[in-house]
Amino acid sequence: MPRADIRALRHYLFMVDLKVRITDLNYGGHLGNDRLLGLLHEARVAFLASNGWSEMNCAGVGLIMGDAVLRYQGQAYAGDILRFEVGIGEPRRCGFRLYYRVTRPADGAAIALAETGMVCFDYREGKMCPLPAPVKDLCTSSLGTGERADP
């Protein structure tokens, strides 16, 4: 099976350090794939909060994660501090993409690259809704273009 084609961005808008807990380990003794997705969620919530938003109120709309792509590059263990860098781009009529780079600052190890597709959602109406202008503006700003680094 071919690997997901995810490349790092040239610039990320936000970073947060998170600690790998014992409960984040799988039977192999390293960070489990399900737990990585949970840590990405933590990073996403912190990124949104840094812009004054939340998943329930992102510039006036709710957010739902429509898809996720993870590409593992290395293992992480209990006690490791991981750096989650978050970028934003690819604005669409009803959504956008978030990009993540996960590294271990202690030794510079690459742990993962990931993307999540976020869908704007009106919980009152129970349907997708248009991307708010402030989010679109951030997606298209000079640092939020989603421009990829060279392969």
Where are these regions (language model features)?
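Hydrophobic beta-strand-centered segment that forms part of the acyl-chain substrate-binding groove
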Residues: 47-96, 119
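Short, electropositive, low-hydrophobicity segments enriched in small/polar residues
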Residues: 32-36, 56, 130
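HotDog/MaoC-like acyl-thioester-processing domains
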Residues: 1-16, 72, 77-78, 88-151
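Residue-level recognition of specific faces of alpha-helices
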Residues: 36-39, 64, 117
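Glycine-rich, flexible loop/turn motifs
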Residues: 21-23, 27, 59-61, 117, ...
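A broad, structural micro-motif
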Residues: 31, 63-65, 111
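Catalytic strand-loop segment that frames the active site of acyl-thioester-processing enzymes
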Residues: 1-46, 50
